[in-house]
């Protein structure tokens, strides 16, 4: 049974197999996964609506899709910047940059049709766009292993979202 009831008053006693705190993209995915496995789920969301940061992103998601890439135009001009990056600036992310540089060099030298993309490109992009400073002035970045795991498995995530009825568009 699914309800979207917003409660103004506390309920005396409610139980579920899984309680998810937060109805953003990650919370909704966790709730959907638990429900698919047969668990009863309660989502607790302070905002009174679901979506979280996923609403402000418009649902954008980095996705490696070879079929869409093959149908697109080559993107040589977008790739040269990766060859200029230095591994020593990438800390634990450096191995992905090294592989990406090899991939880009091979692609640029080839007559391959379609847009270039790779898991390593997405990993490097996550590092570049995700690093910043904390309130104490220390450089911070995303968790490399977590980003790598998610991006290496993004096709499974893609097909899971589609199986749940999400419409995917190339942007």
Question: For the regions a protein language model found, what residue spans apply to each?
Answer:
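Beta1/beta-strand and adjacent pyrophosphate-binding region of the FAD-binding site
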Residues: 9-26, 42
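Generic, low-specificity signal for short hydrophobic/alpha-helical stretches with a mild N-terminal bias
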Residues: 2-3, 16, 43, 143
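Conserved N-terminal/central alpha/beta ligand/cofactor-binding core
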Residues: 7, 49-171
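Conserved Rossmann-like nucleotide-cofactor binding loop
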Residues: 26-29, 49
């Amino acid at each position: 049974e699914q309800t979207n009831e917003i409660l103004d008053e506390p309920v005396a006693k409610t139980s579920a197999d899984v309680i998810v705190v937060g109805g953003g993209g990650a919370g909704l995915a966790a709730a959907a996964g638990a429900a698919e496995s047969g668990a009863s789920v309660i989502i607790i969301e302070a905002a009174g609506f679901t979506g979280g940061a996923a609403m402000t992103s418009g649902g954008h998601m980095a996705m490696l899709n070879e079929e869409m890439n093959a149908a697109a135009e080559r993107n040589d001009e977008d790739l040269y910047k990766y060859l200029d990056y230095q591994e020593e600036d990438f800390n634990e992310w450096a191995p992905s940059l090294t592989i990406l540089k090899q991939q880009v060099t091979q692609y640029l030298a080839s007559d391959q049709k379609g847009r270039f993309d790779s898991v390593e490109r997405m990993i490097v992009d996550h590092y570049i766009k995700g690093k910043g400073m904390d309130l104490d002035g220390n450089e911070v970045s995303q968790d490399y292993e977590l980003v790598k795991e998610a991006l290496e498995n993004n096709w499974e995530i893609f097909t899971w979202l589609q199986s749940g009825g999400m419409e995917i568009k190339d942007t």
